[in-house]
């Protein structure tokens, strides 16, 4: 069930972030991503509260990404990790280029 929940959200080539809105690391990751202007439908925020039991979802995250914590961030079906991974990419000034290369940003 967790696999289906996650894979349905990763079906399109987009940026998907699984969060808990009470988590400060999730809010920080959203702040980084919200600096960019995404094409319609190219960015999805998924509150993990939508899935019960949450532990099953976290177990699946661990199976496919190596981590149970949120945020879990995907570019297409590829996990880039969590907040610290996103922050590292952003601090290298590479995030915008990556997002452009996968075609999720507005270019005008």
UniProtKB/Swiss-Prot annotation:
Induction pattern: Expressed in the intermediate phase of the viral replicative cycle.
Disulfide bond entries: 23-26
GO molecular function: glutathione disulfide oxidoreductase activity
UniProt-annotated location(s): Virion
CC terms in the record's Gene Ontology section: virion component
SUPFAM superfamilies listed in its UniProt record: Thioredoxin-like
Pfam families, per database record: Glutaredoxin
Record carries keyword Disulfide bond: yes
InterPro entries: GLR_AS, GLRX1, Glutaredoxin, Glutaredoxin_euk/vir, Glutaredoxin_subgr, Thioredoxin-like_sf
Domain Glutaredoxin as annotated: residue spans: 3-106
This protein's UniProt keywords: Disulfide bond, Electron transport, Redox-active center, Transport, Virion
Record bears the keyword Electron transport: yes
Family per record: Belongs to the glutaredoxin family.
Function summary: Displays thioltransferase and dehydroascorbate reductase activities.
Protein name: Glutaredoxin-1
Origin species: Monkeypox virus
